[in-house]
């Protein structure tokens, strides 16, 4: 089972973005879901299944990533490759992904229907998708937090639980490119 994570950002402006695999950073390109799958077929699936995302200023948007969600995996890929809001918005507009470490692999590549990004502040819902980490982009860079325990032993949501975000560049320093 993968180390699952949430990738999130709060938009600083209103913008409409449709995921464009050709606008991904050179160091973190698009890839098909299956290694033996034709790249052109995967691109057709993405084009057919992806929808425009309407980001609103001040709103938080998040996607799920199944593999390598720990700081040394997804965190390093984010810090090294997704350095400005436009690049982050394009990634979020890809929708939920199997992986983003090394290659961005949205679930739409295998023909799945596009699911709009979560458009709510980070909170207990993150635990409900079985994610272990949250990666959050800010104008100051990427931050990461383990998902805290939002529920007591009886399954009742605790009040006042917060994420303990740390700069990803510090948490994963030994794994980052210079």
Predicted regions and their residues:
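A short catalytic or substrate-binding loop motif that flags glycine-/basic-rich loops and adjacent residues
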Residues: 1-4, 44-46
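Extracellular beta-rich globular recognition domains, centered on the fibrinogen C-terminal
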Residues: 58-86
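Short beta-strand scaffold segments in enzyme catalytic cores
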Residues: 4-9, 49-53
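Short loop/turn segments at secondary-structure transitions that flank enzyme active sites
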Residues: 1, 13, 68-71
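Short, solvent-exposed aromatic-acidic interface loops
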Residues: 20-29, 35-40, 46, 61-72
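Short acidic-glycine loop/turn motifs at beta-strand connectors
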Residues: 10-15, 54-58, 137-141
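Short regulatory "switch" loops immediately downstream of catalytic or recognition motifs
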Residues: 7-24
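Low-complexity intrinsically disordered segments
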Residues: 80-178
């Amino acid at each position: 089972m993968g180390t699952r994570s949430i990738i999130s950002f709060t938009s600083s402006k209103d913008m409409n973005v449709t995921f464009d695999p050709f606008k991904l950073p050179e160091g973190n390109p698009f890839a098909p879901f299956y290694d033996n799958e034709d790249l052109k077929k995967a691109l057709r699936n993405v084009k057919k299944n992806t929808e425009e995302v309407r980001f609103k200023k001040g709103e938080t948007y998040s996607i799920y990533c199944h593999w390598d969600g720990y700081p040394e995996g997804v965190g390093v890929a984010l810090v090294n490759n997704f350095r400005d809001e436009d690049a982050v918005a394009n990634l979020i507009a890809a929708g939920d992904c199997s992986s983003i470490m090394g290659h961005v692999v949205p679930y739409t590549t295998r023909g799945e229907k596009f699911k709009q990004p979560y458009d709510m502040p980070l909170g207990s819902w993150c635990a409900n998708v079985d994610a272990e980490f949250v990666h959050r982009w800010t104008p100051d860079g990427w931050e990461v937090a383990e998902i805290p325990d939002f529920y007591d032993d009886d399954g009742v949501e605790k009040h006042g639980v917060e994420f303990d975000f740390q700069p990803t560049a510090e948490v994963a320093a030994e794994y980052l490119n210079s």
